[in-house]
Design a protein with these regions (language model features):
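Single conserved hydrophobic/aromatic residue that forms the stacking wall/gate
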Residues: 2-13
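Beta-propeller blade signature
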Residues: 6-7, 55-70, 117-129, 182-195, ...
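Surface-exposed loop and turn segments in beta-propeller and other repeat-based domains
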Residues: 14-26, 72-90, 130-152, 202-208, ...
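Structural signature of eukaryotic scaffold interfaces centered on beta-propeller domains
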Residues: 27-36, 91-100, 150-162, 213-218, ...
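Conserved beta-propeller blade signature
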Residues: 39-41, 102-104, 166, 222-225
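Short, conserved, GDST-rich strand-edge loop motifs in beta-rich repeat architectures
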Residues: 42-59, 105-120, 167-184
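Loop-centered beta-sheet repeat module
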Residues: 55-119
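Loop/turn-rich, solvent-exposed surfaces of beta-rich toroidal or solenoidal domains
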Residues: 149-226
């Protein structure tokens, strides 16, 4: 319910009470945050009574906090696209900034579990504290180059450079009866072209379940998890070619749920 403000790396200095931003339960469900130009932008999931927001709450919310005054400036809301749930709390890279200083926010759309809600990506441009009205990329129902079925929501996303990000798209077309996006073997690894709003299938990885899908920068490339019906492990991805090394760097018994490389 609270969010910690930060003035630079490691300098946590005051607790912000954001309960007033929550709907119905005084808990806005703070997700991923980023600091830019003296402001912290915090995605809000707005979950009520479970893992989803209410059916009639079709908007994406972000709290804006001034790090100089330690005060909440405002909550910004995007209400025209039908997006909901700004950022995925278990994916630290679902809110990120490109080289231009523009912030991108991945919205989950209630994991496709609530009718009428959509997943997509929003932007807050450099120097602004409001959503960019010219940018809203709808992921739900979008086509993926090299994939016959349409997208559901972005299960994970990791920004690399030059408008390209990598991650997984949950595809409801692969669900078996009674399955949801977490347990189903239905997540496809893709390249996100943020500037042109396009997705492309990454060859060499099978469909994964919804747990082994996270991606991290790794040395000069990326480490990408995968939990398919045959193998669970972490693979190396070359962002220059978008190619996967077919031999996993590490194999795991359980789902490789989180990855973070500590290096230069």
């Amino acid at each position: 319910r609270d969010v910690l403000g930060s003035r630079g790396l490691g300098d946590v200095y005051k607790r912000q009470n954001l309960t007033s931003l929550g709907i119905q339960d005084n808990n806005p469900d703070i997700g991923i945050m980023i600091e830019r130009d003296g402001y912290v932008f915090a995605g809000l999931s707005q979950m009520v009574g479970g893992w989803t927001s209410p059916e009639n709450y079709k908007q994406a919310d972000v709290a804006v906090i001034d790090t100089k005054t330690d005060k909440l400036v405002k909550m910004i809301s995007e209400k025209t696209s039908g997006f909901s749930q700004a950022t995925r709390p278990i994916d630290p890279k679902s809110l990120f900034m490109d080289e231009k200083g523009d912030i991108y926010i991945s919205c989950l759309g209630n994991f496709g579990m609530v009718a009428g809600h959509k997943a997509g990506i929003l932007r807050i441009k450099k120097g602004e504290t409001d959503f960019d009205p010219t940018y809203h990329w709808t992921i739900t129902g979008a086509s993926i180059e090299g994939e016959e079925k349409v997208a559901g929501f972005a299960a994970s996303i990791c920004y690399a450079a030059n408008g390209k990000a990598y991650g997984y798209i949950d595809i409801p077309g692969y669900y078996k009866p009674g399955e949801t996006g977490h347990g189903a073997i239905a997540s496809r690894a893709v390249v996100f072209d943020l500037y042109n709003q396009k997705m492309k299938k990454i060859e060499g990885l099978d469909l994964s379940n919804g747990y082994g899908v996270l991606v991290s920068k790794y040395k000069d490339g990326l480490a990408i998890a995968n939990a398919s019906t045959t193998t669970k492990g972490i693979y190396y991805l070359n962002p220059q070619t978008d190619k996967i090394n077919p031999i996993p760097m590490i194999t795991t018994i359980g789902n490789p749920m989180a990855i973070e490389w500590f290096g230069n």
